[in-house]
């Protein structure tokens, strides 16, 4: 006996009825969504480049790859780019605030890499505590300082913690010359960064619908 399925089995509408209209997504919303993803992919790409160039598995502070300075400069520029991305919606002051917070995020991460490289446990603990405190400050900025906010403090805190935890896994894998683990950690960082980018772009699009009308 043949099994016959109508389209209503998948849409949940009665046979012959008109399905509800799908929401129309404007080209400007798609462009913004993709641009935000590009910014956060730049963030993790240049962060990874810096991690590799630090050569954390070589316990000599004088040993780094020659591209470290250029990679760091590009990574710091990415923080400016991310801050600039929210200026059309939240203004220049808020954009500059986000850039400053993200600049500290990168600067402290550099301290962590240096401490890990030379095996300075005390310096690592100090920098790591400040790194997570800075992540909380970023979460507060996204959830409380911006008006309207991009999500709850709990959501933003979890997002930032996941980002730091995944990046730490990447550093630890390289420290231990665990190249398979390093690749797996980067895949995790990449997926998490895309989720973070989507959370931010979706929040802005929802908060400023007039700027993204079809």
What are these language model-derived features?
Residues 1-8:
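Sec-dependent, cleavable N-terminal signal peptides
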Residues 6, 16-56, 60-65, 72-75, ...:
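C-terminal amphipathic alpha-helix
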Residues 76-113:
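Mid-chain, structured segments of secreted extracytoplasmic proteins
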